[in-house]
Amino acid sequence: MNANPTPSLIGRLAGLYCLAAGLLAKLEPLLLLGFRLYIARVFFLSGLTKVRDWSSTVALFTDEYHVPLLSPAVAAGLGAATELSMPVLLVLGLASRLAAGWLFVFNIVAVVAYYETLTQTGGVNDHILWGTILAVLTICGPGRIAVDTLLERRFAPGS
């Protein structure tokens, strides 16, 4: 008997697949960082726009955005605060799942409150993309390039 048999075609293909999967897995932290930076930019710039022209922002929340249960001024303030604070957490990778989850819900509220205009302008597609990325970050976490990872290593049970 041959102690060192030649790998079959399936064995070689499986080996190549495992090699490729291992190489791609090394890109995961960069992909998650890219997602965090992209989403942070989108929401932070939106928050800056709200703050720069506050009277127009309140007018939009009065006339266009229909946020249930909140006055337009309160809704505008909470919206701006969310869009300016949560992206900072995402960039740092600090409380990332909380920040991504919060922005995920915020994104849904924006679509519901502004759906008619978004569908007319095609903007709903952007919100679907953002929601998908935020869902990935909420479920998968920020990746290894994050303050959360350092904190988990230091303070997680059994570390």
PLM features: residue spans?
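Residue-level detector of alpha-helical secondary structure
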Residues: 42-43, 56, 60
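Extended, low-polarity transmembrane helix blocks
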Residues: 1-52, 69-81, 85, 92-159
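Short juxtamembrane and helix-loop transition motifs at transmembrane-helix boundaries
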Residues: 58-68, 86-91
